Amino acid sequence: MDEFXXNSNKNRXWQQFFXYPLFFREDLXAIXHDHHLDRFGSSEPKEIXVXNFXSFLTVKRSIRRICKQNKSISLFGNSDSNKLIEYNKNFSFKSMLEGFTIVLEVSIAMRSKHFIKGMDGWNSLRSIHCIFPFMEDKLPHSNYISDIRVPYSIHPEILVRIFRRWIRDVPSLHLLRSILHEWKNSFSRENLEKVLITQRENTRFSLFLWNSYVYECESFLIPLIKRFFNSQSLLYGSFPDRTHFEKKIKDIVIFPLHKISTKKIWLLKDSFIHYVRYGERSLIALKGTHLQVKKCRYHLFHFWQYFFHLWFQPYRICSLELSKTSFSFLGFFIHVKMRPLVVRAKMLDDLFITDLITNELNPIAPIRSILFSLAKEKFCDISGWPISKLSWTSLSDDDIXDRFDRIWINLFHYYSGSINQDGLYHIKYILLLSCAKTLACKHKSTIRVVREQLGSELFTKSFSKEREFISSSFSKTRSQRERIWNSEISQRNPLXXLWQKMENKQIEN
């Protein structure tokens, strides 16, 4: 019995590194085929399977021929002038991408032990607002921050090398290489013949490549940076007895006391690093000297250049001093501000009053950028004056009010933790008046007539859900300085994403 268990464990370990047996699973092929049909909304799969082009049957036959060392293999047929055949070829290729992605995901789930252990706590980490409480705890104790934009352009052979670390069978690697080069050729019209864009389209395969690439970067990068900072802190050490240390310095005649800066020694003490990432944006919070920040930037450049064999543009790493400048992240302006505190301490009969200075994280909602985004979406003009949404006049009154209501609720929940709440209510006024003008334009009347017809429903039924959020989140005993982050936000606000894209273009230019 023990021998049987040992053999089963060996077979299980063998399956973790060899992915081609999963291609022969009919259930995985059916799941990928049905998933791809659901995405395209097709219910007639009769014209989809083309025997001369890519399909799961072609994949199986190709793997068998590779095992027999037959070099005359063609995974993808030549292009034909017939549009139906070309459509079937593209559909079959995309369907095979779905199947191959499922096979890779299943093999990773079988191999990774942390995958099953982390499933219970996955739901608690879905919100992107879990980043901001972490930043409120860590950033006030840092003095530098490095804003990194992860490169999303990578050669297909680099991706093959990444997957080669945990895929041991040659047929699957050859199939992956063929798929990547075929997928790369689809972007040849845009002069991307040598580069694979892993975030080019929001497909399952592209997201899988992006996550694998980012995981590979972080698995090597984060331990490297932590090891660097740990070595720096051990090199200089900490000096708890500073008085005794300065007395020793006074006894040295070669180094006069006025030429020794004890402030630099204090900054070299207890260096640490914190890392957080969302999408392609990464933040590294540092506590150390400017020299350590320059060394960290130097190592980051060389890491991507030599490990992934790609040129890392200098504008992708921006090092900032938190006490002097602010930075943008996830649609917020982040600023660390010093806040003085007066502390009274009583010892026996004496009363001492001391001043303490603490750092506080202040996330600011970009009101002007939101107004510009609303103007671009035709909710107001450039000056911020509300206008009617003419494209929504064909909808019913309830649909118009619900659409404006959802826009405001999403904005309010996303920027619920910002310190400039007054600017958000200015946005609410613009949306409310734009909603009234849209209804007036639909009924060919004025805002006053619409308000008289609808009564209080326009102002109470719509744009009122934030009151429920405030009443459930705040209480009379809570501090007014404490911010509330909504834990149901799983993605960035579209207006914030639009503003972030504009910021990225300005940085590149």
Curated annotation (Swiss-Prot):
Location in the cell reads: Plastid, Chloroplast
Q: Tell me its family.
A: Belongs to the intron maturase 2 family. MatK subfamily.
- Which GO terms of the molecular function aspect are on file? RNA binding
Q: What function does this protein fulfil? A: Usually encoded in the trnK tRNA gene intron. Probably assists in splicing its own and other chloroplast group II introns.
* Originating organism: Thujopsis dolabrata
Statement: the UniProt record of this protein carries the keyword Transport: no
State the InterPro entries in the record: Domain_X, Maturase_MatK, Maturase_MatK_N
| A Gene Ontology BP annotation from the UniProt entry | mRNA processing
Q: What is its main location?
A: plastid
Q: What Pfam families does this protein map onto? A: Intron_maturas2 (PF01348), MatK_N (PF01824)
| Keywords of the record | Chloroplast, mRNA processing, Plastid, RNA-binding, tRNA processing
One GO CC annotation: chloroplast
Q: What is the name listed in the Swiss-Prot or TrEMBL entry for this protein?
A: Maturase K
- The gene that this protein is the product of is matK
> What HAMAP family has UniProt attached to this entry?
MatK
